[in-house]
Structures are given as structure tokens and as C-alpha cells.
């Protein structure tokens, strides 16, 4: 019979030790034994809470931006998948909350940003929230590391080459390799995007497809035949002072 006092002491000791480890080390620890795996599998444990409160900006934790990621562990994961301050146009900066990009009011420029982490395997979903005016062109989608992040003029930069795929929210057009790939979604009089709506982007690296959801409604597959390359969540914008947030959700739920 397990002594409950000893079990509690063991729990408290693990809690203290794991709180001082790096996140990569926690992943290794979860593979040591079943006991440690179950301990770390509690995504709202004090260990994940401690790491979340110490690594995430307070601005993000105070807002409702992370409403779709309910546990401390998923909030941490979303933060490490957020926009990269080192992989964006010079006219873009990432706000202190770590999840929102701000495009500076620079004339005759189109500017883009990519996430910190890209995907080549598995299925992934993330939310994009456009929190400012769209302007004449506002594109969400994916790109490889080779896709440009800035160009002259006001254009659909994302989708302008063979390294990027995008949905222009202003005109409801799909874009790739500089060509319009058709209207999207395939609905009569499809409603236009409203500022503040959450769009879910679904990347399936097994089926090589990209799809979108809006208001929990699946809009259909937008792109097929994606290449076997690492693909990154990406947006491109033209409107000065507009802001776009991105929250990584993990594996999409079917149904």
C-alpha cells in the first residue's frame, strides 16, 4: 500500500524539480517512466502554470486572445509558435504580447510575417485574427522560408510566387504563383471577412492540403498538392497600423 504522505512528498519534490527545468528537458522527463509521464500530462499542473507565468508576456495572459487555448501547457505551446520577430518585413514589429504583429504606416509597401515554427509533418491548426482595417489587400496562408516578406506597392504578396499560398480576405480569392486560383469559399455571395473574426487555418501535411474555417464552419479545401517542404503560417498586409494576431492550437479536431 502506498503511503499517501510519501506520495504527496514525492509529488511536491517533482513539482519543484520540474519547475526549474527547461521545456525541452520536461519533454525528455515525460519519457522516463509512466509516473513522470502522467505527472507532466496534467496540462494545468503547477509545473506548467509556473512555466507559463514566467515565460508568457503579461499582456497576453491578461487578454482574451488565448481564449481558444485553455490550459497552461497549450498557452506555452502557442507562444513558441507565434510570429517571429526575426522573420518579418522591416516595416512590421511584434507587439509586447508576443502574438500580435503591427504594420507601420509605410507608403507603397506590402509587408509580411512568418511564424517561429514551420511544419513538414502532421496536421496543424491555428487562428488568425485581423484586428485592424484590411485595406485593399489582406492575405492569410502559408509560405516557405524562400518567400519574400516585403515588396513595393500594394499587392497580394502572399501567393505572388511558387513559395506561398494565400486567401485574400478582401476579394475572397485564392492566390498562388502570382495567379488567382479561384473564388473562396465556393458559396454564392460568400460573406466578406469582418474585422475581429477568428479564422482557423488547417494545414494537413499528410494529405498536402490547406483549408480554412470561419465561425466554426468548415469552408472547404483551399489548396491541394502542397510540396514536401517546411511550411510556415504567414500573412501579408498593406494597411498602415493594422494588426494581426495568430494563435497556434495544435492538432485539429475532426468533425
Swiss-Prot record:
Any one biological process term the GO annotation gives: protein ubiquitination
SUPFAM superfamilies linked to this entry: Concanavalin A-like lectins/glucanases, F-box domain
B30.2/SPRY domain segment(s): 61-253
Chief location bin: other
A GO-annotated cellular component: nucleus
Keywords linked to the UniProt accession: Neurogenesis, Synapse, Ubl conjugation pathway
InterPro entries: B30.2/SPRY, B30.2/SPRY_sf, ConA-like_dom_sf, F-box-like_dom_sf, F-box_dom, FBXO45-Fsn/SPSB_families, SPRY_dom, SPRY_FBXO45
Pfam families per the UniProt record, alphabetical: F-box-like, SPRY
Family, similarity comment: Belongs to the FBXO45/Fsn family.
Name of the protein this chain belongs to: F-box/SPRY domain-containing protein 1
Source organism (scientific name): Drosophila yakuba (Fruit fly)
Gene: Fsn
Amino acid at each position: 500500500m502506498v503511503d499517501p504522505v510519501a506520495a504527496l512528498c514525492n509529488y511536491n519534490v517533482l513539482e519543484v524539480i520540474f519547475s526549474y527545468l527547461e521545456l525541452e528537458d520536461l519533454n525528455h522527463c515525460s519519457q522516463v517512466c509512466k509516473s513522470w509521464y502522467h505527472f507532466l500530462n496534467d496540462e494545468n499542473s503547477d509545473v506548467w502554470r509556473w512555466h507559463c507565468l514566467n515565460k508568457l508576456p503579461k499582456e497576453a495572459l491578461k487578454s482574451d486572445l488565448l481564449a481558444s487555448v485553455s490550459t497552461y501547457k497549450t498557452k506555452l505551446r502557442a507562444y513558441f509558435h507565434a510570429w517571429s520577430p526575426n522573420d518579418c518585413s522591416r516595416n512590421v514589429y511584434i507587439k509586447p504580447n508576443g502574438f500580435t504583429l503591427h504594420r507601420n504606416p509605410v507608403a507603397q509597401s506590402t509587408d509580411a510575417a512568418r511564424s517561429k515554427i514551420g511544419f513538414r509533418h502532421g496536421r496543424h491548426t491555428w487562428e488568425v485574427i485581423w484586428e485592424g482595417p484590411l485595406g485593399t489587400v489582406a492575405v492569410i496562408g502559408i509560405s516557405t522560408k524562400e518567400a519574400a516578406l516585403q515588396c513595393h506597392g500594394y499587392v497580394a504578396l502572399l501567393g505572388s510566387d511558387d513559395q506561398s499560398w494565400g486567401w485574400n480576405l478582401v476579394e475572397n480569392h485564392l492566390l498562388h504563383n502570382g495567379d488567382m486560383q479561384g473564388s473562396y469559399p465556393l458559396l454564392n455571395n460568400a460573406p466578406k471577412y469582418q474585422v475581429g473574426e477568428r479564422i482557423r487555418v488547417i494545414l494537413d501535411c499528410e494529405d498536402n492540403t490547406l483549408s480554412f474555417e470561419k465561425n466554426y464552419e468548415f469552408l472547404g479545401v483551399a489548396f491541394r498538392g502542397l510540396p514536401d517542404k517546411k511550411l510556415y503560417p504567414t500573412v501579408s498586409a498593406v494597411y498602415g497600423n493594422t494588426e494581426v494576431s495568430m494563435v497556434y492550437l495544435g492538432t485539429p479536431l475532426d468533425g
